[in-house]
Amino acid sequence: KIDKFYLLKVYKKDNKFLLIKNTKFNFLKNLKIFPMNEIEKHSNLKKNLNFKISNMSMNITIQFNKIKGSIPNSSWIDSSKLDSYTLPSFTKKIFKYLKKNE
């Protein structure tokens, strides 16, 4: 298994979260995900989530950010209406985690 580390950026406005169309990673291609970057493993980073996707273990650190300007290929998703969106289970699990850890 490959261990990978990601910094997931959460932008929240009222009850809405910003998602982007994934064009960066080979997994979940063209689906709506939270903006994130692959990072080096740092011992001082707090790991919030771990996902196993095929042969990869994803260690995810969550960072809350203020929106500055516009982010390409993005849209605001109302977290109280998640069922009305077509989202990958990966994204839904992150929503569930955020709701539980508000």
What are these regions (language model features)?
Residues K1-E102:
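Intrinsically disordered, low-complexity, charged terminal extensions of DNA damage-control enzymes
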